[in-house]
Design a protein with these regions (language model features):
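Glycine-rich, basic loop-to-helix element that forms the pyrophosphate-binding segment
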Residues: 38-54
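Short beta-strand-to-loop element that shapes/binds the nucleotide-sugar donor at the catalytic cleft/hinge
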Residues: 90-106
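Short, acidic, metal-binding catalytic loop of nucleotide-sugar glycosyltransferases
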Residues: 2-13
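Short beta-strand-to-loop acidic/aromatic patch adjacent to the donor-nucleotide binding site
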Residues: 57-67
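A recurrent flexible, glycine/aromatic-enriched loop bordering the glycosyltransferase active site
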Residues: 115-135
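C-terminal catalytic/acceptor-binding lobe
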Residues: 153-253
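Acidic donor-binding/catalytic loop of UDP-sugar-dependent glycosyltransferases
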Residues: 66-79
Length: 253
């Protein structure tokens, strides 16, 4: 993945900031522009911590099961500097299929109401989504970033983009796809905790929140340090303690 990032971003400097329970591999530890912050919290908590510690002018939020397309991030930064004001965001379009196979995503996929779980009265029908996004780092922090009461990174990504749009920002689609993401049709062994978080907490929380037609008028800005209100040890994942490595996670699920 790191090698593909370098090919996607040749003309601009970048830093890869990650957060999670395990240290960097020997190979990544040799790279000057890669940082790992150790934390045992939920995916949302870790993403928030990583984002807060980002130093760059722009913040790109993406996923780890992705391969970056050559020159794609360069093109997105070019577009950002051409069309975006501080409150605007680039939707880093992606494909998702088994073994990173490029696929076509319907143009309506990038609109909230294309997705059943997002069809609530508090979500305007013309709002767009950007699970992978390029945003001004300081503006991200002013907004408060991700709401970490959502444990997994899905609904709080939508929530952030809805808050951006309510605040007057525009979501511009990337010129081309930025990543090809992997997809597992039968789920993954290590995704049990994620599925539980999605079903038991995040989806009902989002539904309750956005059933209010005025929700966005009340919560454009949230506390940046909201991650501190979450579990330091994510109990869904680490009920038996923190494993020594990723293989132990697979064995215990």
């Amino acid at each position: 993945m790191y090698d593909s990032i370098k090919k996607s971003c040749k003309r601009y400097s970048f830093e890869l900031v990650m957060c999670g329970p395990f240290p960097l591999t020997e190979e990544l530890a040799k790279e000057d522009n890669v940082r790992m912050i150790i934390d045992n919290g939920s995916p949302s908590r870790c993403a928030q911590i990583a984002a807060i510690n980002a130093d760059g002018r722009l913040l790109a939020h993406l996923v780890d099961d992705a391969l970056f397309i050559e020159d794609s991030l360069d093109q997105c930064v070019d577009l950002y500097d051409t069309v975006c004001d501080k409150k605007d965001v680039i939707n880093l379009r992606y494909t998702e299929a088994l073994n990173f196979r490029p696929t076509h995503m319907h143009k309506d996929y990038w609109y909230a109401w294309f997705h059943g779980p997002l069809k609530h009265t508090g979500v305007p029908k013309d709002y767009k989504i950007a699970c992978h996004h390029l945003i001004d780092t300081e503006y991200f922090k002013e907004l408060g970033g991700y709401d970490c009461s959502f444990e997994y990174q899905n609904f709080n990504l939508h929530d952030l983009m809805f808050r951006v749009q309510k605040d007057g920002g525009t979501l511009f689609d990337s010129p081309n796809n930025v990543t090809n993401c992997d997809w597992y049709p039968n789920g993954m062994v290590d995704h049990k905790a994620i599925e539980q978080a999605y079903v038991d907490n995040d989806e009902p929380l989002f539904a309750a929140m956005y059933s209010d037609p005025d929700v966005l008028s009340k919560r454009i800005y949230i506390e940046l340090d909201n991650w501190k209100q979450t579990e330091e040890l994510w109990s869904r994942r680490f009920s038996k303690g923190v494993p020594k490595d990723y293989n132990e996670i697979l064995e215990n699920n």
